Regions:
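ATP-dependent small-molecule kinase phosphotransfer cores
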Residues: 33-85, 94
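Walker A/P-loop
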Residues: 14
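Short glycine-rich anion-binding loops that position phosphate/pyrophosphate groups of nucleotides
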Residues: 84-86, 108-110, 159
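A glycine- and Lys/Arg-enriched "phosphate-lid" helix/loop adjacent to the NTP-binding pocket
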Residues: 99-143
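P-loop (Walker A) phosphate-binding loop of NTP-binding proteins
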Residues: 8-11
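Post-Walker A helix-loop "phosphate-sensing" segment adjacent to the P-loop in P-loop NTPases
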Residues: 22-31
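Hydrophobic anchor at the beta1->P-loop junction of P-loop NTPases
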Residues: 5
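NTP-dependent small-molecule kinase module
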Residues: 19, 23, 140-177
């Protein structure tokens, strides 16, 4: 059984995914890295996910996300960090759910907003003319949806790093293989 960590940008999916994988002694997979590799192979151009989204557009980016998630069907006993937007597509959620325990890393809206709006340049999903409102709208929509699709939600707002890793490991111990 895999452990899938997902949540809104800036919640720590990659950071905690690496730490949990190390503690469990298993592989760590970051779907963003795989998207970048596939794009580089297909287009002979090395770009970050943000750059791919901007250059190729949201449809191409979501198609790459879908391709990556479908390619993980035979992966077992791994920790997988999945970009927040990927979880908005039903087919991605269902593909991951087959062999994975989905954990939503919840972080307080104001904490995340501060992190995300401090990025330069702003993420592509933020309207530069009204960054706070666009973040609040995105957060509200995704949080509602994520709570419906997750197996478990972990509120990491006031938790220390070690405790977060410990809690994720505990959550996955009781899951049937």
């Amino acid at each position: 059984m895999n452990t899938v960590l997902f949540g809104i940008k800036g919640c720590g999916k990659t950071t905690f995914g690496k730490l949990v994988a190390k503690k469990k002694g298993c592989a760590f997979i970051d779907t963003d890295i795989l998207i970048e590799k596939i794009y580089q192979i297909n287009r002979h151009k090395k770009l970050s996910c943000r750059e791919i989204f901007k250059e190729a557009g949201p449809l191409t980016f979501r198609a790459l996300e879908y391709e990556v998630i479908q390619s993980l069907q035979d992966v077992q006993n791994s920790v997988i960090a999945v970009g927040g937007g990927a979880m908005l597509l039903y087919e991605n959620v269902e593909a991951l759910r087959k062999k994975s325990h989905l954990i939503y890393l919840f972080l307080d809206q104001e904490v995340l907003k501060k992190r995300v709006l401090a990025e330069d340049p702003l993420p592509v999903f933020i309207n530069p003319n009204d960054p706070e409102s666009s973040f609040d709208k995105m957060y509200s929509e995704r949080d509602d949806f994520y709570q419906k699709i997750t197996n478990q939600k972990l509120d990491i707002t006031s938790m220390k790093e070690e405790k977060i890793v410990e809690k994720i490991c505990e959550m996955t111990k009781s899951v049937k293989q």
